[in-house]
């Protein structure tokens, strides 16, 4: 491993807010994104859009001759301004990026995504039946951007931001990868949580003597759930794990390209999460969260009847919050909360030849707002 692993990295517990801080190097309230981009309260800190007088990292890099590319999630524009007629000033091309391919909202279907190329809404280039998946498509597009850049302007520096739909819900991944995890999580979130803490202590991610807090509020012991619920919950977690592995495989294609094109030693790579694991699946998870969001209950019998559909094109799955608790080991609470489980997140920095202990650990406090000024420096 060549990336430095930061154990004290902090975010803002939600996606839009963290992205605003990441892109500006400032507190998210200070730039107008105190909450999600979906909402505009009218108050200066909560406009659902990065303030026009605050430069983004892409805008600052452009001033130094960089070409800037973005693929994937944006979620930094008010929903009322994401239609085909704009306004476009808050879209990626209006905030310093030269090319954009991705989606504007918080999430999208991985098999039927709501895609935008630059400033134009477009149809997805494939379907589940033709083998399409958004993660692969985004990395394909990122590679096209980089190859085109190198062919046309090899002496011009570039900045690429890759924001996958993974691992935000809906958790959708190829069936063979989901099947791979069929038994991986059969022991449940309590056993998984204990095992992860032991591994964290062994590898130095947390200090010796670190103890788990009690289960989060409303999370029941795995043993208190019925066997058929165990099967459902394990399958939902398997879909999440498969989606993560699927992205990891395709991210590897991007790193391989940097290596093959002899750019890897000149490229700093940062991999981070914008918030902790999500509690939005509730106590039992969802096979079709859209029904629940529209006030249509999803009874346990209905979930169980659709076990084989989980992760496929006709589902919008999310895992139970017991798995989110395990994902945030050894911290309390989740995404949306200002507890450790919401704001302490992974950061890996790969800077070949620039640090003496590539693959080492860093335990100091750092915040997502530190990244833009550090990159600029």
Label for each model-derived stretch:
Residues 1-377:
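Formylglycine-dependent sulfatase
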